[in-house]
């Protein structure tokens, strides 16, 4: 089978998480020859060690620190626009989108370097199954036209990016038919992805939420109803080539504090 999946991992920390995802693929019989791993890192990180890891794992891929990205922009004739993908920011994930667009990959997968797959779940295979889903699926909507992706949990959590004004919504579920899925949003166990205010409400001044999520919090797949929005977290996401532009992460640090933590949640909105 052709190498049709571009796996984008922005990393300045635990880049060896890639080994766990590759082990998961092999354990579940997923063909790793389909994968091309793009590690997006910085000049102060050990890019050579990352390249050595990809070689050891026998997987195709490339590592781009800031200098490598500048060279790539020059080669593509787009150096004048390099500021649209900020360095040393999670929004550098957008470089992986550009690389994927310039290639002939049919699918993209985002992975954060502080995550690991569950051994019992086929990470890549499940995402691809979702993208090829054809048939019935649960449809979720609300009277606020926002869907809380954690609505199945009994913990009453709202993920980072969910509007405060849309909380306490009335959730409605139905069954619909779908034959064209463009994005598969995975969820996460253990530490939930909350914003600062919700972490303080659920946790303490140490910046750590107290609630933990587990298997029982996510027991079935669903799609958002037509006309409803939902939040997107790019730590566990697969998508088709046709929607690459929707996942561009805008630079959000153009302010007096140089703070830009809301990069990925605005994908597809602005």
Predicted regions and their residues:
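Acidic donor-binding loop at a coil-to-helix junction in glycosyltransferase catalytic cores
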Residues: 256-266
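Short, charged/polar "capping" segments at the starts of alpha-helices
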Residues: 15-18, 43-51
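Catalytic metal- and UDP-sugar-binding loop of GT-A-like glycosyltransferases, i.e.
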Residues: 111
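N-proximal low-complexity "stem/linker" segments adjacent to membrane-targeting elements
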Residues: 1-40
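Conserved catalytic core of nucleotide-sugar-dependent glycosyltransferases
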Residues: 69-80, 118-251
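Active-site-proximal specificity loops/subdomain of glycosyltransferases
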Residues: 46-104, 120-133
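Short beta-alpha junction loops
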Residues: 40-45, 115
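Short aromatic/hydrophobic "clamp" motif used to bind/position activated sugar donors
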Residues: 108
